[in-house]
């Protein structure tokens, strides 16, 4: 738990610095922030995946909700890593960097995010229809898909200059959102793992 609190505190500090850094040199310190978040996304996804797979293999049983959560964990981790590298794939480091450059990045991020949103909507429908979630019934899948829709709707609002948020800061918020979702799904997998943790009194 301490590891994840440390990661989340690092992400929050990155968001806090993003706005001030982005108005100076868009490929200076912001690039360093993106690469740091990329390393965190890869490490988090790899660690969570290994821990979950080894734990489930020892238990010998995967339920449908387990598979859905694990898939969501991996997708959120991959999305976070992809968004970290997206500016380096789209913006030429030799070109003059402007607000329009980050707008292009947000449009690409939003387009890819729409694919993730429709996947999450289909998963939420399965969870609601079969009532697979152990302790939240139907409300949690609905809240999850709504927050995802709001996050990517905000991306397009910022890209079209309808909301006053710096484009780089919006990108960092989006990366943090996916990392938070991955951590949350990992904790849900651990909580409903079916493994009994013995206390010192046992």
Predicted regions mapped to residue ranges:
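Hydrophobic alpha-helical transmembrane segments in multi-pass integral membrane proteins
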Residues: 81-88, 146-163
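Short, highly charged, low-complexity non-transmembrane loops/tails of multi-pass membrane proteins
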Residues: 193-202
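Small-residue-rich transmembrane alpha-helices that serve as helix-helix interface/gating elements
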Residues: 168-184
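Hydrophobic transmembrane alpha-helical segments in integral membrane proteins
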Residues: 23-44
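N-terminal signal-anchor/start-transfer transmembrane helix
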Residues: 39-58
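Membrane-proximal helix-loop-helix units in multi-pass membrane proteins
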Residues: 89-152
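N-terminal secretory/membrane targeting signals
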Residues: 1-18
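Juxtamembrane helix-loop boundaries in multi-pass membrane proteins
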Residues: 35-39, 62-80, 131-148, 201-202
